Amino acid sequence: MQNLKIQEEVNSLMRLGQHFDDQLKLASVELGDFSDDDLALLDKCAQYYSLLHIHDINLNYLRDFYCAKKRECIENRQTTVQQRVELQRILSSIEEATRDVVMLERFNAAAEERLIPDIVVMQRNAQQLATKQALLDRQKTLKIPKDFSIESVIEKVDSLEQR
């Protein structure tokens, strides 16, 4: 008698397993589609079903679970692609900024080579002021006659050139 009950229970469990496989096929779900984490969750779900003596899986929940996991995977891929694009944009900006810095450093070095020290500039200014003052002093000492006409000098030069 005990043997018969056990055999009936085994047959019942085999029919239940076949029923679940058929329901998974109806949902177009293969167990190979799931990751290890998903399979662990399904194992846990099966344990709860056996503990609670639930013998019918609602396919809608299983489909929702599968779709949610698939959507999550697609969103993660999309996020990864967006982050790669953003990283490329940032890297190209960094590269462009680096080129600009190198160009500005070359310009700065060239400008520093051409730079005249302040002491030299002050000496040149002092020398120019001294020369200007000397020329002004010479001009003051130069006596120009009052009847001097520049036009008559120009005419004489022109006549000499013509001869």
UniProtKB/Swiss-Prot annotation:
Changes seen on gene knockout: Mutants are viable but have greatly reduced levels of augmin complex subunit Dgt2. Mitotic progression is delayed but is not blocked before anaphase onset and chromosomes are properly segregated. 7% of meiotic chromosomes in spermatids are missegregated. Mutant males are fertile but mutant females are sterile, developing fully mature ovaries but laying eggs that fail to hatch. Chromosome positioning and segregation are disrupted in oocytes. Chromosome spreading in oocytes following nuclear envelope breakdown is not limited as in wild-type and instead is spread along the spindle axis.
Coiled-coil stretches: 86-115
Any one of the GO CC terms: microtubule
UniProt superkingdom: Eukaryota
Self-association state and partner proteins as the record states: Component of the augmin complex composed of dgt2, dgt3, dgt4, dgt5, dgt6, msd1, msd5 and wac. The complex interacts directly or indirectly with microtubules and is required for centrosome-independent generation of spindle microtubules. wac interacts directly (via coiled coil) with dgt2.
Predominant place of localization: cytoplasm
Keywords: Cell cycle, Cell division, Coiled coil, Cytoplasm, Cytoskeleton, Meiosis, Microtubule, Mitosis
Function according to Swiss-Prot or TrEMBL: As part of the augmin complex, plays a role in centrosome-independent generation of spindle microtubules. The complex is required for mitotic spindle assembly through its involvement in localizing gamma-tubulin to spindle microtubules. wac is dispensable for somatic mitosis and for assembly of spindle microtubules in oocytes during female meiosis but is required during female meiosis for chromosome alignment and segregation. It is required for microtubule assembly near spindle poles in oocytes.
GO molecular function: microtubule binding
GO biological process: cell division; female meiotic nuclear division; mitotic spindle assembly; mitotic spindle-templated microtubule nucleation; spindle assembly; spindle assembly involved in female meiosis
Protein name: Augmin complex subunit wac
Annotated compartments: Cytoplasm, Cytoskeleton, Spindle; Cytoplasm, Cytoskeleton, Spindle pole
Tissues in which the UniProt entry reports expression: In adult females, detected only in the abdomen with no expression in the head or thorax (at protein level).
Source organism of the structure: Drosophila melanogaster
